[in-house]
């Protein structure tokens, strides 16, 4: 992605297509159905560009978020938006301006950097790479960078790996604080997505600028169950949460939303969709409305 011209990098801006009626667009977000002043009223719904947004260039992505009233986005790296660490200063300013000129918030950047590696060189490469994206997120107007733990390698004492991950996160937390960027640790990995393991990692990663990014995994339901596992890490939640489609599968999303409302969570609930609907715009708007209905239902229980 070298020597991008402005036209190549940012793509063509297109007019907003008339994909929804005015009634559809204002049915939830514009009317703000959350009960004002009640716990959970400051939570916001956004998109992770994992599958549904991976092939949208930046103008298309922002336009589609505006159309669906999904007004926050975490940009995954290595996707069509092209927001990567090798952007020059001018290109970074252009990305920032595109978001500033729209109602869509750039929540942050989603990377795949991980800190479980046995090889010191690979570990250091991922730490250094994450720092590059901290600088990038700062420059383009984001507020944080998502990273991963991401495993407990065979043949290495578990405590040693946990210590290594935690210390790496503390280093990034200190670095990110200088740039106003939160380090968001996705609950991810074959073994590290177990909440008791995440709790142990965060016992080491005690820097206040390092937060848990809840990831809505099946492992959340193991052992004593969702609420128990939720409570293990809730005091370390960062500003982002990842969910899947709210109406697909067996994950108890209403219970999860109830827990976030009860604790008066004020961050972003970000959809990291896995399906391949024919009409992603319609599906995205539907997920936003389902989220708002769940929040309203949770508030009514209080």
Cite the ranges covered by each PLM segment:
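Histidine-acidic metal/acid-base catalytic patches
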Residues: 2-46, 53-69, 192-302
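Active-site acidic/histidine proton-transfer and metal-coordination neighborhood
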Residues: 13-22, 33-39, 66, 96-105, ...
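Extracytoplasmic "Venus flytrap"
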Residues: 51-55, 80-81
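Alpha-helical packing segments of well-folded alpha/beta enzyme cores
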Residues: 61, 95, 129-133, 165-168, ...
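Catalytic domains of carbohydrate-active enzymes, especially glycoside hydrolases
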Residues: 61-78, 141
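Conserved beta-strand positions in the central sheet of alpha/beta enzyme cores
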Residues: 74, 108-110, 146, 242, ...
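Glycine-rich, proline-tolerant flexible connector loops at the mouths of alpha/beta enzymes
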Residues: 76-96, 152-155
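Flexible loop residues that form catalytic
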Residues: 78, 114, 150, 246, ...
């Amino acid at each position: 992605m070298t020597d991008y011209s402005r036209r190549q990098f940012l793509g063509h801006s297109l007019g907003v297509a008339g994909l929804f009626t005015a009634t559809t667009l204002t049915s939830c977000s514009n009317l703000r159905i959350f009960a004002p002043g009640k716990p959970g009223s400051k939570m916001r719904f956004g998109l992770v560009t994992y599958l549904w947004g991976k092939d949208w260039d930046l103008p298309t992505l922002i336009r589609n978020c505006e159309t669906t009233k999904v007004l926050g986005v975490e940009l995954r790296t290595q996707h069509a938006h092209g927001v990567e660490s090798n952007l020059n200063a001018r290109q970074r300013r252009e990305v920032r301006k595109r978001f500033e000129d729209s109602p869509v918030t750039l929540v942050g950047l989603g990377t795949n950097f991980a800190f479980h590696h046995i090889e010191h060189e690979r570990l250091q490469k991922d730490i250094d790479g994450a720092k590059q994206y901290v600088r990038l997120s700062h420059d383009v107007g984001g507020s944080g960078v998502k990273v991963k733990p991401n495993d407990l390698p065979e043949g290495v004492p578990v405590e040693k790996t946990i210590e290594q991950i935690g210390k790496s996160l503390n280093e990034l937390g200190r670095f990110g604080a200088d740039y106003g960027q939160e380090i968001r640790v996705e609950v991810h990995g074959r073994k590290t997505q177990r909440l008791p393991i995440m709790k142990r990692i965060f016992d080491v990663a005690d820097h206040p600028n390092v937060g848990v990014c809840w990831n809505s995994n099946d492992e959340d339901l193991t052992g004593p169950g969702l609420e128990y596992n939720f409570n293990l890490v809730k005091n370390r939640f960062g500003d982002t949460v990842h969910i899947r489609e709210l109406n697909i599968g067996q994950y108890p999303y209403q219970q999860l939303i109830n827990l976030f409302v009860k604790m008066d969570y004020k961050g972003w609930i970000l959809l990291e969709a896995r399906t391949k609907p024919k009409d992603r715009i319609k599906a995205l708007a539907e997920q936003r409305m389902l989220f708002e209905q769940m929040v309203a239902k949770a508030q009514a229980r209080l």
